[in-house]
């Protein structure tokens, strides 16, 4: 895999991308933030933009399941996993406080540890496995394991398993951040999530306008 693309409409995608980055630090990744428009428009434009960037492998990340063929829920969670689902309560345990922390861009804060401990205490001692069923949870998979490990409960992380199965090739850890609308507060939050400098650039279909073609390469192409 030359490069993995992550397209998203809210900050949930940043947590997913960062989780993958921590699992595969050398993997080249492109993040595309497109906050406006309907989900249908987002999916259609994402496929077009990934084509322009020649990115074959990508995920679309949305807090809820979409009809996208590269939707996180379909691609990552598609296999189905046994265990108590940590989600909205629709299929398992309602962990809405964590969902709010993610949507507010606060999932990296220390108070989340207290929330995890609280959820752990509410889980039956007869539970053998819990599944991190929503996008973003993998960002703190180690903290889930610490909390639920007190009851000897196994934590299943679908994203980690998907990465292990599908992402073998590595690059030099090049991260590219694009947005369709400027939002510097959002950029600051993403920087806090990655804990390293982050600079978004405006997305354009042409690679020159995206800054992906160096001057020397432009000269050679003209000759």
Predicted regions and their residues:
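Non-catalytic structural scaffold of enzyme domains
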Residues: 1-223
């Amino acid at each position: 895999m030359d490069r993995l693309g992550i397209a998203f409409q809210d900050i949930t995608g940043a947590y997913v991308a960062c989780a993958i980055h921590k699992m595969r630090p050398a993997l080249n990744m492109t993040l595309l933030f497109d906050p406006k428009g309907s989900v249908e428009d987002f999916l259609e434009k994402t496929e077009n933009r990934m084509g322009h960037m020649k990115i074959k492998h990508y995920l679309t990340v949305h807090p809820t399941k979409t009809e996208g063929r590269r939707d996180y829920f379909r691609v990552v969670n598609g296999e189905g996993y046994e265990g108590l689902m940590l989600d909205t309560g629709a299929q398992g345990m309602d962990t809405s406080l964590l969902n709010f922390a993610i949507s507010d861009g606060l999932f990296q804060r220390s108070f989340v540890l207290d929330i995890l401990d609280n959820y752990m205490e509410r889980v039956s001692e007869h539970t053998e496995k819990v599944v991190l069923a929503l996008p973003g949870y993998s960002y703190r998979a180690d903290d889930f394991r610490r909390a639920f490990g007190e009851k000897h409960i196994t934590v299943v992380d679908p994203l980690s398993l998907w990465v292990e199965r599908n992402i073998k090739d590595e690059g030099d850890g090049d991260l590219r951040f694009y947005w369709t609308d400027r939002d510097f507060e959002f950029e600051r939050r993403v920087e806090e999530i990655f804990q390293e400098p982050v600079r978004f650039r405006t997305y354009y279909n042409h690679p020159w306008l995206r800054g992906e073609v160096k001057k020397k390469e432009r000269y050679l192409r003209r000759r």
